[in-house]
Amino acid sequence: TEYLKSTDRMQKTIVFCASEDHAERMRIALINYNSDMVKENPDYCVRITGSDVYGKSKLDYFISVSEPYPVIATTSELLSTGADCKMTKLIVLDKTVESMTTFKQIIGRGTRIREKDGKTHFVVMDFRNVTRLFSDPDWDGPIEQDEGFRHGASKPKGGSHGGDGKNPPDDPAETPIVDRAGCKVKIINK
């Protein structure tokens, strides 16, 4: 949500979750964090999984070039293969992926470029450190990271997080929590 708020809240996003239950919990969390967008359209965020009849009914709208909603789809397996998600600009990995084939299929959801429709790139947000398992520099080329990207830099002056609108506030350094897979963990609610 923070990334979408700092870039484009209407960019098509797929969140890959560990299970259908996880996809439902993620959908609820994203609805809570994006309640203003959900008020505009209740289908801003939907779960699209094999057992979700309502979500599956929204699949054609999600993959459509001309339909703005749904914007965020949470899923476990259904969107991994076979869905031509033409306008997906953000792929979020919140599940462990151990198969190179599955990984490439998931990433493939974002690779469709449609310059005439405004789709020139896509972003992978990896919360499980999956991308390091499938690093193939000979095939993929060097990893591009925007070193100039500053989280929250587009927030309005005098925002709720302090700072002057140009520079982030002087927050005390937090000691990161690292899980067994080496991923940094951020607790957002206790």
Which positions does each model-derived feature cover?
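Intrinsically disordered, low-complexity boundary segments flanking structured domains
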Residues: I31-D36, R109-E115, D164-G165, D171-E174
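Detector for Asparagine
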Residues: N32-N34, N41, N129, N167, ...
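Short coil/turn helix-boundary motifs
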Residues: S6-T7, S66, A181
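Generic detector of leucine side chains in alpha-helical contexts
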Residues: L4, M10, M26, L30, ...
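Conserved RecA-like P-loop NTPase helicase motor core
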Residues: V38-E40, Y44-A153
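Conserved helicase/translocase motor-coupling segment
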Residues: T1-M37
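A sequence-composition feature that detects small, non-aromatic residues
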Residues: E2, A18, A23, A29, ...
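Long, largely alpha-helical accessory region at the distal end of helicase-like NTP-driven motors
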Residues: T131-K190
